[in-house]
A protein has these predicted regions:
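A helix-centric hydrophobic-segment signal that preferentially recognizes long
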Residues: 2-208
Length: 208
């Protein structure tokens, strides 16, 4: 009888040890997955921060571009106003993304606003072709060089950001990470894409 009791207690202890071990493994796994998701999400946020720096630089340059053109393009008021309006809308959309880089709707809205801005800049570039004195202006040449350099940096930062988004979303959607992501509200991140396919390339503001 005594031996049976000892055997029963030993079996129960073994079961508890096994269950405890399984629980410990699960806890460690959850912590590891959670930390990995946090690291990838922070990478997305950092990637956006790099884009944001370049976008702000470009938004600051566009008024200089418009101001440099004003003196020559007296009959292109509507074109210049369209650039200013599109710039202001894109800047507001970028500010919304900065508040929450993983907000997919905000990122998509920025993509639309950027498409409109690049379209407006493209129209301005076409209009400038009729003003050779403007094209040769030292002030305009300086602004165009700075703007082109900034556009290239935006494109580079956007690619790095999108790569981070893909890594984060892949981890978030993979099993068993998807379970942890759902438990702790890791929302899907959106890639930063310009909506209008016609203006996805870096806008060219050089004049020859």
């Amino acid at each position: 009888m005594f031996m049976n009791t000892l055997l029963a207690l030993g079996a129960a202890a073994t079961v508890f040890i096994i269950i405890g071990g399984i629980i410990l493994i699960l806890v460690v796994m959850i912590i590891a997955i959670y930390n990995a998701l946090v690291a990838l999400r922070n990478r997305v946020k950092n990637g956006w921060a790099q884009i944001d720096v370049q976008l702000k630089r470009r938004y600051d340059l566009i008024p200089n571009l418009v101001e440099a053109a004003k003196g020559y393009m007296k009959h292109e008021k509507e074109t210049l106003e369209a650039v200013t309006s599109a710039r202001n809308q894109a800047m507001a959309a970028a500010k919304a993304v900065s508040a929450n880089p993983t907000d997919g709707n905000a990122v998509k809205s920025l993509g639309g606003a950027e498409g409109a801005l690049r379209g407006a800049l493209g129209n301005l570039t076409v209009a400038m072709e009729a003003y050779p004195d403007l094209k040769a202006s030292a002030n305009m040449l300086q602004v165009q060089e700075e703007l082109t350099t900034t556009e290239n940096k935006v494109a580079f930062s956007r690619q790095a950001y999108n790569d981070s988004v893909m890594m984060y979303n892949t981890k978030r959607e993979s099993f068993p990470s998807n379970i942890i992501a759902g438990m702790f509200n890791f929302s899907e991140a959106s890639m930063f894409e310009v909506e209008d396919a016609a203006v996805k390339e870096v806008p060219k503001v050089q004049f020859t």
